[in-house]
């Protein structure tokens, strides 16, 4: 959006199949208002959010490199280390159930992976504010800074969900994954058993989401995503270093 005096980013509502609670976003914006990686909005109202335009903006898809993965790992560590206490929650199981229950014809074999839900529940422990939507487009690279944007799904959650989500949603390869984990886990040991379960859960979650979207919209991109996530479910990542 361009005015006589300035340029702005304008964001409106995204995917209607996702569970969005606007109170979650408003709370996150308030909690993060003084963080260096946060792009403070000049206007927000329901689905509409406006921030000051950043020159030459790029997202992770065009800036994918090991050095930038290190930057992302450090940013997420800084975010999580503050342990912001949010009243509004993001429950991954509720998210999964929402997708699962909207599918008219469940794909053959989906129920074979339902054991992942039980494993996830045993390890899940919400204890801080998380972003919960770490797709490539939510990392904004400018000349001098890296911002984490779009907090529509932010809420009280287990921070391992964010860690697994970044790896899963961006389909990091082995080298990228290890680079990310080394950048993130600087003062604590990574719980690989927990991360493995959370990675499997994220792949199951996005497989179910993509299956739903392909059924409802019949757009090939969702079929491709479903195939990729099913491949990951059948061939889990090996991440110990």
Short names for language-model regions:
Residues 113, 196-205, 230-241:
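Charged/polar, low-hydrophobicity segments characteristic of intrinsically disordered regions
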Residues 145-148, 177-194, 237-240:
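Short amphipathic alpha-helical segments and their helix-coil junctions
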């Amino acid at each position: 959006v361009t005015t006589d005096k300035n340029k702005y980013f304008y964001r409106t509502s995204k995917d209607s199949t996702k569970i969005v609670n606007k109170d979650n976003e408003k709370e996150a914006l308030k909690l993060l208002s003084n963080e260096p990686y946060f792009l403070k909005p000049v206007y927000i109202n329901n689905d509409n959010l406006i921030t000051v335009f950043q020159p030459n903006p790029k997202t992770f898809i065009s800036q994918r490199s090991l050095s930038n993965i290190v930057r992302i790992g450090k940013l997420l560590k800084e975010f999580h280390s503050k342990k912001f206490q949010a009243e509004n929650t993001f429950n991954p199981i509720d998210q999964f159930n929402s997708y699962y229950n909207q599918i008219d014809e469940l794909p053959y074999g989906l129920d074979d992976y339902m054991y992942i839900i039980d494993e996830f529940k045993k390890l899940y422990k919400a204890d801080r504010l998380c972003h919960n939507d770490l797709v490539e487009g939510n990392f904004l690279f400018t000349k001098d800074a890296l911002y984490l944007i779009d907090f529509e799904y932010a809420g009280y959650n287990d921070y391992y969900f964010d860690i697994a989500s970044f790896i899963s949603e961006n389909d990091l390869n082995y080298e990228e994954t290890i680079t990310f984990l080394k950048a993130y886990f600087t003062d604590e040991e990574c719980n690989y058993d927990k991360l493995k379960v959370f990675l499997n859960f994220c792949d199951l979650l996005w497989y179910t989401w993509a299956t739903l979207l392909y059924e409802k919209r019949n757009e090939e991109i969702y079929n491709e995503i479903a195939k990729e996530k099913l491949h990951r479910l059948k061939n889990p990542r090996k991440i110990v270093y």
